[in-house]
């Protein structure tokens, strides 16, 4: 601490705290003349206006952000364009661009001063930490060090206003300490390619619970929308005869009408929040434990280790909520006879406990866990390959936008699910049967009595779920993030 304070006193250029902030204060902090600033802004405009047309459109801004290697350029381009285009004529001329630069630099200087409470003309790690804590953001020492290191371009341990400005100049949102931290978190921590198993970026933020709310609502919406396909898939998986989709649909309708297609969906929704929470926290614990064992920071562990940590976290989450999954399957596969109503959840759960014992709630758990690592590995490898192909052949080396990433994730997820689908069929059959059976026994009996094709019963409705589920989850999640002010 003392070393940092000494460094701060030696390296910072003290600046008196002014009253109302003006461009003159910005020039003083940057040690820049008006002419030099004009030239700098004009040069930046020309950089974006690479075709010398005299104005900027959204495509030019997006191209410029990609050239500057700014992550999320596809998204910020639209938002930056909207903020700059003051007269809403669909183009940004130099005067509009200049007005944005003036407003943004003044805004950044104000918050720079708010963090620099000692008015030394620089931000120290301690000052930044104090501001984050006051904003309700928990941050570990190593995260703070990475934050400072990312912004501190000359590596002197402190952040000058020029470095602060460069980091945030093209950030189109209001520069509050919460937004700035969230921006850094996304820029530096989120890597969709390496997070195919569990996405990161929720670290120790004050609004962490809101991410779970957004994810929970998105998951509930997508599961409800695809519930009929899920019920159809489960019924086809347990069929001993040739599984025909039309007959299965008729059976569902006969037994429950429209509501029959949504049987078990309530439990499916209930699983979302605890499964996501357990998976996230287990992932963080496994990353920390593996990083400590390898003598590395958890942020520096490689893709393979992340894949393993994600798989282990998925296994823990799956095992924790597995009884709910088994009861859901029993509800979905229950056949009403002679007008007998489907039993209530409590009655069905009690019946399983009394007649089959507590172990029955974990029937099929082993094949379920067995498929996690292969699925994650195939999903990750396919995702990375598809993203690279899209970058090379479709986007001309630009970074994939959210829709391209969604498409890559959808295809890779479908491929991974198909490869481990036989394990899913075996799991469902073990869950649905009252008799105690082993995984190998179900495999052998299925193949000998029905052939290898039986291991893929219900695959079509399972694949048909993928696109709408991914699309609905993405759209609802993005909408919820805006509603909860997470963006």
UniProtKB/Swiss-Prot annotation:
Residues 1-211, 284-310, 384-405, 478-487 are mitochondrial intermembrane. Residues 36-71, 72-107, 108-138, 139-174 form the EF-hand domain. The keyword Ligase does not apply. It is found in: Mitochondrion inner membrane. Residues 230-263, 325-363, 424-457 are mitochondrial matrix. One of its GO terms (molecular function) is ATP transmembrane transporter activity. Ca(2+) 2 binds at residues 152, 154, 156, 163. It comes from the Eukaryota. InterPro entries: EF-hand-dom_pair, EF_Hand_1_Ca_BS, EF_hand_dom, Mit_carrier, Mitochondrial_sb/sol_carrier, Mt_carrier_dom_sf. The chain crosses the membrane at residues 212-229, 264-283, 311-324, 364-383, 406-423, 458-477. Ca(2+) 1 binds at residues 85, 87, 89, 91, 96. Pfam families: EF-hand_5, EF-hand_7, Mito_carr. GO terms for biological process: ADP transport; AMP transport; ATP transport; calcium ion transmembrane transport; phosphate ion transmembrane transport. Counter-exchange transport activity is saturable and inhibited by pyridoxal-5'-phosphate, EDTA and EGTA. Activated by calcium Ca(2+) and manganese Mn(2+) ions, and slightly by iron Fe(2+) and zinc Zn(2+) ions. Repressed by copper ions Cu(2+) and slightly by magnesium Mg(2+) ions. Magnesium Mg(2+) ions promotes slightly ATP uptake, ATP-Mg(2+) being exchanged with ATP(4-). Its main location: mitochondrion. Expressed in flowers, leaves, stems, roots and seedlings, mostly in aerial parts. The keyword Membrane applies. It is a multi-pass membrane protein. Keywords: Calcium, Membrane, Metal-binding, Mitochondrion, Mitochondrion inner membrane, Repeat, Transmembrane, Transmembrane helix, Transport. One of its GO terms (cellular component) is mitochondrial inner membrane. SMART domains: EFh. Solcar repeats lie at residues 206-289, 301-389, 400-483. The N-terminal domain can bind calcium. Belongs to the mitochondrial carrier (TC 2.A.29) family. This is Calcium-dependent mitochondrial ATP-magnesium/phosphate carrier protein 2. It comes from Arabidopsis thaliana (Mouse-ear cress).
